[in-house]
Amino acid sequence: MKQYLHLMKKVLNEGTEKEDRTGTGTVSIFGHQMRFNLKEGFPLVTTKKCHLRSIIHELLWFLKGDTNIAYLRENQVSIWEEWADKTGSLGPIYGKQWRAWGTPDGHQVDQLSQTLELLKNNPDSRRMIVSAWNVGELDKMALAPCHAFFQFYVVKKTLSCQLYQRSCDVFLGLPFNIASYSLLMHMIAQQCDFFLGDFVWTGGDIHLYSNHLDQAHLQLTREPRSLPHLLINRKPDSLFDYHFEDFSLEKYNPYPAIKAPVAI
């Protein structure tokens, strides 16, 4: 994960101080790309301990098309608590857009299912895209999508994916995002009988919050360790039938966690 630490150092060294929606303040750069070869290991940050259970449950929750945090609460995942209303609803965020994008005539589009069909039946397509950035529903969302748009690419039975992330919290959010989309790639590769290729991450406004700077400097003192390996213990009938127990991680040997406040 040296790419991640390089980006963190770049933000610290080259970033500009900016105000932001949360009122916290950031140091920010605009535009950067990283590439992770998933054949070399699962890209979960080792320079601090990451909560893989939350990453897995959040992705399974997205895949269900769910936008209420009840499922997350049942599984002791609290990462969306601050944005939910009294009923637990977050509005039409990621899961709704991935699985049930509303059309002007009142129908719904399951973008993920359509993309899976293309991956299986027309893998040379340039339309294997899923978007969460639904302009017509942004004002109904508790939080506008940060990881907004992703595209798949297949060559010689090898699956790659590129994500565009319009807003990136480097210290807290980015390790989750990299691991989450890499996990999704593992699942789709299994479902489609593909080899694993590259996860390509492209960022827009890439920032460290002003109350994360000390934590970032601490993390940069730590030498990255070998990447762990993700195992999927069974092959479900579809992408939407995975359970938490289907995943295990081997040889994850991180440094201790580094606590930091979440900007709301």
Swiss-Prot record:
Binding annotation for dUMP: R21, R126, R127, R166, S167, C168, D169, N177, H207, L208, Y209
Disulphide bridges, residue numbers: none
EC number: 2.1.1.45
Biological or metabolic pathway of the protein: Pyrimidine metabolism; dTTP biosynthesis
EC main group: transferase
Any one GO BP annotation for this protein: methylation
GO MF assignments: thymidylate synthase activity
Tree of life domain: Bacteria
Cell location: Cytoplasm
Keyword list, A-Z: Cytoplasm, Methyltransferase, Nucleotide biosynthesis, Transferase
Catalysis: reaction(s): dUMP + (6R)-5,10-methylene-5,6,7,8-tetrahydrofolate = 7,8-dihydrofolate + dTMP
Pfam families: Thymidylat_synt (PF00303)
Positions contributing to (6R)-5,10-methylene-5,6,7,8-tetrahydrofolate binding: H51, D169, A263
Gene3D superfamilies listed in its UniProt record: Thymidylate synthase/dCMP hydroxymethylase domain
Residue stretches spanning the membrane: none
Gene Ontology cellular-component annotations: cytosol
Parts forming coiled coils: none
Location of the active site: C146 (nucleophile)
Family named by the database record: Belongs to the thymidylate synthase family. Bacterial-type ThyA subfamily.
Described purpose of this protein according to its UniProt entry: Catalyzes the reductive methylation of 2'-deoxyuridine-5'-monophosphate (dUMP) to 2'-deoxythymidine-5'-monophosphate (dTMP) while utilizing 5,10-methylenetetrahydrofolate (mTHF) as the methyl donor and reductant in the reaction, yielding dihydrofolate (DHF) as a by-product. This enzymatic reaction provides an intracellular de novo source of dTMP, an essential precursor for DNA biosynthesis.
Oligomeric form and interacting partners: Homodimer.
UniProt-recorded name of the protein: Thymidylate synthase
